[in-house]
Amino acid sequence: GQSDLTIERELDASQALIDSLNEHGVDLGEITRNLESEGVVKFEDAYNSLLDTIGRKRAQYVDDLKDLAEPVRSAVKKAAEGVIVKRLFEHDPTFWTQDVNAFDEITNRLGWLGLPEKQFAFLPELTAFRKKVEGLGFTNAFVLGMGGSSLAPEVMSLTLTPQAGGIDLQIIDTTNPDEILARLEGVDLTKTLVIVSSKSGGTSETNAALQYFWKLYEDLGINDIGKHFVAITDPGTSLEVMAREKGFSQTFLAPADVGGRYSVFTTFGLVPGAVIGVDLQGLLEKAHMADLRS
């Protein structure tokens, strides 16, 4: 067959056919009213059935919670009597164990507690870095990182509204060549900042991505490649050394006592946040307020 716009053809004949239906006992008005009333009834029945199902499910879930009431009350009472929140924020290792041999390891993992308040002092440096990025004319940025080193920037780029002056940010947390090529499509590398992010400094996937991106700039014949690269890592890592040797534009060091999953308020989250134009002052204020309320 052949598709064609036929609805506008022979309009007079179509109207005459419709008019003739009454002569054969077909009342289109009545048919329409019946269909409408039946449709409303069916919709109402379906809606009421849905509400009944939700009601039964709710009753079931509420009933299931009864068994949790006493354990929750007991846990809250225990937390209050043990001054748990206070001990946690004081980095008290006895909250977890009485083994003195484990104290150092525990206290070296608690830097995330109260971190937002400490990072207010870092804001001037972040503001200066953002202006530097704008001054260099960068319009795009990549974060090369895995896990905690890239999750915070990804969440920020997807959920927070940037201020004026922010640039587009993409995450490279894969070694899949097709995906990397797709991310690079249409990107002007001469106007691109590459943020190499690794807490350990030795993440193999991140290092592979670094080598690949560095080679891209070499192939473009760019002399001062280092100005396109920034490193984020812990103090004393191989990445810190490499960044210095290769002449990276800047290296940001993160506190060693903050694990990757808590790194949103360390340089791993705040530096990319500055690049894309996140209101870091407002972000830290809200996080600090949450700390105070806890």
Residue positions per predicted region:
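Flexible, acidic glycine-rich loops studded with aromatic residues
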Residues: 1-59
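A generic structural signal for short
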Residues: 5-6, 117-118, 202, 228-229
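Terminal amphipathic helices with adjacent charged low-complexity linkers/tails
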Residues: 45-82, 285-290
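Extended, charge-enriched "interface" segments that sit outside catalytic cores
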Residues: 63-135
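Glycine-rich phosphate-binding loops that contact phosphosugars or nucleotide phosphates
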Residues: 127-293
